[in-house]
Amino acid sequence: MTPEQRLVRPKIKPLRLLLSWLVAAAALFVAAWIVPHVEIQTFLGAVVVSLIIAVLNALILPLVAAIRLPLTLVLGFLIVLILDALMLLAASGLTDNAIEVDSFGWALLTALIASAVTVVLDVLFGTNDDDTYTLRVIERIARRSGERIETEVPGIVFLEIDGLALPVLQRAMRDGNAPNMARWVAEGDHRLAEWEPDLSSQTGASQAGILHGSNENTPAFRWVEKATATMMTCSAPADCAELERRHATGVGLLTDGGASRGNLLSGEADHVILTVSRMEAEKGANPGYRAFFSNGFNVTRVLVLFFWEVFLEWTAASRAIRRDVRPRGHRSGLYPFMRAAMCVVVRDLIVYGVLSDMLKGRPAIYATFSSYDEVAHHSGLERADTLEALRKLDQQFGRIDRARTYSSRPYEIVVLSDHGQTQGATFKQRNGYGLEDLVERSLASGDVTGFSGGDEQNAMVGLAVSEATGADTSKKKPKNDVSDRQVVVMGSGNLGLVYLMEERRRMTLEEIEGRHPALISALREHPHVGWLLVRSEKDGPVALGGGGARYLEDDRVDGEDPLANLSPNAAHHLRRTDGFADVADIMVGSFYDPQLDEGCAFEELISFHGGMGGLQTRPFILYPASFTLPDEPIVGAAAVHGVLRGWRQQLQGDKIAG
């Protein structure tokens, strides 16, 4: 699927240009009809005004984007919005009654409404997939920046869809919700493969393994390091930086000139945008956003689509309540705005970062898109609005695919996921109380502190906000001291962690039963708990269930096997996790029902990941047919790193280290 390297410049198509011009004129004409104190007498006048604005836009905004202004996101948005209004006022002054605008404020409102109408008309007339103008500007910025690399050595683009399971992708391909990826497979250009994540099936652990080759001692999304009584979280910038420091060994996937876009960890990339572990490097101005601001329509379009996404979420949530859809997640408060930020703003910034990287010829690019994961958590993994988020991602992948024709080197595209998701009503919805409540009432003594909620999407939006304002939040210390807590209970999807802080080391099964006689039995016998991982002083690591136990050192089963409904590799994953320095005193896995394909999260997410059971352990790799996979199954994120880095070395040989 790699295009022959031709260093072709994007060419403007006259008919497409004419149609876009007429669409812009129609949108402006409608906006002037809606907004008071703005008047366009005839459609011909709208055509003239739209031409003037197009010329001014082509002259001014690429210049603003190309010069080295300290472009934070907020400053860039404000500059473009102000220029949009000023260009309308300029058109009013340059024409003889083609348009009349009373003031700057009315001009700004007209520009916003015209953008909203343009978005609708672009979809109706099929002009929303033409990136020719944008690519021409990005290419010009790349050449003038001095960063453009022109070579025949192929590059590789890794596009991660956070939280998408292989069976969900296959059904989306079949049903028309992923047409670009379906076409790649149907034409024989790409193939699909499955891999299995580690016990902690969440982005922090998976990206540590995929991008750095190791995720040792990452037992969950959040965990306690008992020796220092500190809590680590895979979305806190300081903790992500520490996680990267522990695992970076010089063989990161993106070493030697690579680019990280929208990731928790950087893969040792030289170029980063929206990368949580490198927040210090990203504070303030980021030249990576110049491509986005090179076209004024991007800004107004993003604002329009942001509020449209908020409206879509409100209507979808209301429809779910009206139809009494179950399971049903919490979707009120700030969540609609969080969803809109992930599905529109962050997504588009990452796409433009990738397009810029390709036209500059970066050798390796890894970008994470979390909109599907975010919507699925609250709506369900295959609900209509969730699949619509996937369809929009697929549309963006089509843009990236088409941009290869104009890049300064050939590119291969690999699409993968870091984990899947499993669905089901939460533990609290089923029981009326949470895991922390169950633990607290089963203790002999002690107060329980529960931690759950929050995910990598919160981190990404927070990072975007801090970049937007130029604020330096990298030195803020996370509230992670748990030295004054007696018992800490954490939920990471359907994986629970119980830390008994009375000892600064992991307690054995015998110690726990001696000090808290009711705790283990209350947990293992609960109908919505599938297994417990504890360490016995006598028997070593053991998985306990309501009807039996599996002794992991010799794989002996006594009674019913608590891991029977899980992957054949479940015991391997538990043995590995048991060896981590900071594994919890008690690791708790929810039940999994293979008939209904459901489990339950220990946090308030109806579609979840983080543990074992169901589609959360079935992520995918969509790879070029010219690449080869190992003969053995791909188990663990570090194994994926080996595959992806091997493909990069296959393309680039000794151009990368290691």
Where are the regions that the model predicts?
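Beta-strand elements within well-structured catalytic alpha/beta cores of enzymes
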Residues: 150-170, 184, 210, 364-370, ...
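Short, structured active-site-proximal loop/turn typified by the sulfatase FGly-forming signature C/S-X-P-X-R
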Residues: 171-208, 213-217
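A long, amphipathic alpha-helix that forms part
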Residues: 344-345, 349, 357, 365, ...
